[in-house]
Amino acid sequence: MANHKSAEKRIRQTIKRTERNRFYKTKVKNIIKAVREAVAVNDVAKAQERLKIANKELHKFVSKGILKKNTASRKVSRLNASVKKIALA
């Protein structure tokens, strides 16, 4: 265990940040999964609705500093391509 106050504080901070990061990581995965599930069953309306939500949420995470801008853009772009694919089919 830590012998210094500063080391104990760093441990507390790491635990807190790990929990926060896990929460957001799970949220990102669930958002993407929701869109992919709608695409899998070829439900265009639901997929487009969920894509709109995903776009908003992922870019909100960018503004909070959770995701990098290019990462969010890449994820949205790939989701958009999959939704567009079923919309045209």
UniProtKB/Swiss-Prot annotation:
Record-level GO cellular component terms: cytosol; small ribosomal subunit
Keyword annotations from UniProtKB, A to Z: Ribonucleoprotein, Ribosomal protein, RNA-binding, rRNA-binding
Presence of keyword Cytoplasm: no
One GO term of the biological process aspect: translation
Ribosomal protein is among the record's keywords: yes
Pfam entry (one): Ribosomal_S20p
Alphabetical list of SUPFAM superfamilies matching this protein: Ribosomal protein S20
GO molecular function, one term: small ribosomal subunit rRNA binding
Family of the protein in this entry: Belongs to the bacterial ribosomal protein bS20 family.
Function: Binds directly to 16S ribosomal RNA.
UniProt protein name: Small ribosomal subunit protein bS20
Gene: rpsT
